[in-house]
Regions:
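Basic, alpha-helical terminal appendages of large translation-related enzymes
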Residues: 104-245
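Catalytic adenosine-cofactor/nucleotide-binding cores of aminoacyl-tRNA synthetases and other
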Residues: 1-131, 213-245
Length: 245
């Protein structure tokens, strides 16, 4: 069974993620590596990518401390991964796209010119994400009903997103999502925004994932919407509001 309690074998890990992500896990936690669990896979995939992205910007001493130097015997490959594993998982989840073509449709629209041919490592990651979603995410997917206050916030978010100009950046979208969340019960009085106003608590972003996607958490919502498409996100909110009406 693929339940949480059972460890994975190395072969199973490699059904869901690259050998490099497994090497990173082993490198970081040599003692823990005797027990592999599925829920640490996404973080290790994305952390590996971050270490790789950062490598060329580091000086010699920092490079020696970077796990990718050890994983690749001092010769890490060039990094170019336009999306994260966590984002791919959320795309599969939101679109129920259990095929690579649909996912590549989103990626190609978001980053024109990026194809399975130009980015074979990303193509492999798309396959891993579909396997991971099928075995670990889909079986536990549960949409929760929004409260009345959350419904009102979702309606406002839907309206604000539909006003955005085409081609809005992930940053622009994230700002809109943040602005709409700046209300009770999501205000965070401790974490102030740049302008000194109350910040927005994680509960707001978690609610979006729980209600819209049936999962506990996800990547930055603005980044997700930028790849998924604003119109698709608006339809997704409409679906959630209709489901809970």
């Amino acid at each position: 069974s693929k339940s949480k309690g059972n460890g994975l074998t190395i072969d199973e890990w490699l059904r869901y993620a690259s050998p490099e992500s497994l090497s990173l896990f082993m490198y970081r936690e040599p003692k823990a590596a005797k027990r592999l669990y599925f829920d640490v896979i996404p973080r290790n995939v994305d952390d590996y990518q971050q270490f790789l992205d950062g490598f060329t910007r580091q000086d010699g001493k920092q490079q020696l401390a970077n796990p990718v130097w050890h994983i690749h015997s001092g010769q890490p490959p060039k990094a170019d991964m336009p999306v994260t594993f966590q984002l791919l998982l959320t795309l599969v989840s939101s679109s129920n796209a259990e095929n690579a073509e649909t996912l590549w449709g989103f990626i190609g629209r978001y980053r024109p010119g990026v194809t399975p041919q130009t980015h074979p490592k990303l193509d492999a990651m798309v396959g891993y994400a579909i396997n991971y979603y099928r075995d670990f995410v889909a079986p536990t997917k549960q949409f929760r009903e929004p409260t009345d206050g959350e419904r009102a916030a979702l309606q406002d978010l839907r309206d604000a997103l539909s006003q955005l100009p085409a081609g809005s950046s992930a940053e622009d979208i994230q700002n809109v999502v943040y602005e709409i969340g700046r209300r009770e019960p999501f205000l965070d009085q401790v974490k102030k925004g740049k302008d000194g106003r109350p910040g927005v608590s994680l509960d707001w972003f978690n609610m979006l994932y729980q209600v819209l996607l049936g999962q506990e958490k996800g990547p930055r919502f603005g980044s997700f919407v930028a790849v998924y498409g604003v119109a698709n996100a608006v339809s997704m909110i409409d679906g959630a509001l209709a489901r809970s009406a």
